[in-house]
Amino acid sequence: MQAPRELAVGIDLGTTYSCVGVFQQGRVEILANDQGNRTTPSYVAFTDTERLVGDAAKSQAALNPHNTVFDAKRLIGRKFADTTVQSDMKHWPFRVVSEGGKPKVRVCYRGEDKTFYPEEISSMVLSKMKETAEAYLGQPVKHAVITVPAYFNDSQRQATKDAGAIAGLNVLRIINEPTAAAIAYGLDRRGAGERNVLIFDLGGGTFDVSVLSIDAGVFEVKATAGDTHLGGEDFDNRLVNHFMEEFRRKHGKDLSGNKRALRRLRTACERAKRTLSSSTQATLEIDSLFEGVDFYTSITRARFEELCSDLFRSTLEPVEKALRDAKLDKAQIHDVVLVGGSTRIPKVQKLLQDFFNGKELNKSINPDEAVAYGAAVQAAVLMGDKCEKVQDLLLLDVAPLSLGLETAGGVMTTLIQRNATIPTKQTQTFTTYSDNQPGVFIQVYEGERAMTKDNNLLGRFELSGIPPAPRGVPQIEVTFDIDANGILSVTATDRSTGKANKITITNDKGRLSKEEVERMVHEAEQYKAEDEAQRDRVAAKNSLEAHVFHVKGSLQEESLRDKIPEEDRRKMQDKCREVLAWLEHNQLAEKEEYEHQKRELEQICRPIFSRLYGGPGVPGGSSCGTQARQGDPSTGPIIEEVD
């Protein structure tokens, strides 16, 4: 029997929700997780006993706010001192600490203090998506295309790639979210001739605008713009602040210091925001929000729009910039395509429609799933899928920011202009600034400003051993090379000696080293093993409980009441009571202890039931063993809630 063909998946790793898709038999399928949901919250929670990822983590966030981590995408590839990180920390209930200038989240897991890099948290979400795909496909998944906001810089892309590696994935390609959405939009519109499309992607935490031309399977990005720190969560924050102020006004109490109350309020605000996309008013009802005070209030759509008006309006600036860079007039755009959950907000749609002079917006693709859909198609292309639908699909993306180096006087000398099609390679020759200079210090920047101090330093390296010569004589050739992932490497070569030095940009040592990634891969496997052990433990506990209640139930049955001798009945009842009392005090026992208790109970019950039935049977025609196995997750669902 031949092995199943290896499949690659497309993963939309979102700020608030993630989504996974696969392309097979000529079509994309978006895969539902173990809760039946096609999107999974990008949440990871740590408790005294286990680690939770996705829906399970988000649903217990109010009970465990300090150890429930979300928004890793707003930390990934950034420095701790970054102003956005500092302002976000005010809203997060979990702690963020600095380690070597990099942010790490600090949580309490199994009674110990632990710190995790954002890449590790994101890798846990990616592992969950990988497991979702494996459960659906029935085979291991090793390869993936992962999406990032178009405006993510080099270090954020590198860090996302590292997160994939920690999750045990071979990241085939990092692609831009709006480009992936454009594939989802354009795949079934092959015969329509060349069309200029503007993708407006407003998600939970990031905002991108991309202008593309789509023609016969060629998707060419003309320009991209955006804000890596604008999305639905910022609208939630405005609502939270509004209601916190209202609570203080009405009840004279400040709940800003209570993480649990804030989490409950935030959840209610998120729900109200969604309601306001379809209704003009939303009601919040939170029992005993803070110090026993119930909070019942409402908000109108108009008030919500006023609270967020500056944020909504700010989405138009990147639209104008992308059109300018693409050298297109708004009248030349054939389709304006909405992507991301926040584009459901009526005011956002109205502002955009008015900007395009009343043009009808295109809502034909699912805003929550389009990015994963496009990523799945690109994954199939990179795996060499022969389906005619994707065979001649070509993706031409761009570098979102200009790249260059610092020359004398702190001037930014650009080698790669923003919106240059990638992959790309540019070479320029530089020379020394002073006589007999033994080396050159090359500092690489990204950004659009004339002076490097106003741009973002990506990395620095030295080319030494230049033979003594007057200034201006040595020739140093510098090459900037961007690969298809949008990741940059820079080489400097001294022409006279042929000596070279190279750097793959690491955002001022912000990137994880190979050893660190390997260590995290090992730790991820360890956490997975711990999670499985916890699942087995819970299954053994449920199995024991089910068995006890089955025995107790059998003793109550009319048909058996008179057949069991009083002494045997008492023996079984006493044992059941003993096991239940033991369970009460041993909620966190090991799997083996539960199994031992179950065996002891079986040793008492089996001979009695055997005598009764003249064989190994128990009531209902099932043996003790099968009855007990009902708690086993492999034979059926457990419907018992486990705290």
From Swiss-Prot:
Chain segments annotated as coiled-coil in the UniProt record: none
Induction pattern: Only at higher temperatures, and no basal expression.
Stretches for region Nucleotide-binding domain (NBD): 3-388
Keywords tagged on the record: ATP-binding, Methylation, Nucleotide-binding, Stress response
The keyword Nucleotide-binding is annotated on this UniProt entry: yes
Superkingdom field: Eukaryota
Record keyword Nucleotide-binding present: yes
Residues annotated for ATP binding in this entry: 14-17, 73, 204-206, 270-277, 341-344
GO terms under cellular component: blood microparticle; centriole; cytoplasm; cytosol; extracellular exosome; extracellular region; ficolin-1-rich granule lumen; nucleus
GO-annotated biological processes: cellular response to heat; chaperone cofactor-dependent protein refolding; protein refolding; response to unfolded protein
Region entry Substrate-binding domain (SBD), spans: 396-511
GO molecular function: ATP binding; ATP hydrolysis activity; ATP-dependent protein folding chaperone; enzyme binding; heat shock protein binding; protein folding chaperone; unfolded protein binding
Region (Disordered): 616-643
Location of N6,N6,N6-trimethyllysine modifications: 563
Described purpose of this protein according to its UniProt entry: Molecular chaperone implicated in a wide variety of cellular processes, including protection of the proteome from stress, folding and transport of newly synthesized polypeptides, activation of proteolysis of misfolded proteins and the formation and dissociation of protein complexes. Plays a pivotal role in the protein quality control system, ensuring the correct folding of proteins, the re-folding of misfolded proteins and controlling the targeting of proteins for subsequent degradation. This is achieved through cycles of ATP binding, ATP hydrolysis and ADP release, mediated by co-chaperones.
Record remark on domains: The N-terminal nucleotide binding domain (NBD) (also known as the ATPase domain) is responsible for binding and hydrolyzing ATP. The C-terminal substrate-binding domain (SBD) (also known as peptide-binding domain) binds to the client/substrate proteins. The two domains are allosterically coupled so that, when ATP is bound to the NBD, the SBD binds relatively weakly to clients. When ADP is bound in the NBD, a conformational change enhances the affinity of the SBD for client proteins.
Family: Belongs to the heat shock protein 70 family.
Protein name, entry field: Heat shock 70 kDa protein 6
Organism of derivation: Homo sapiens (Human)
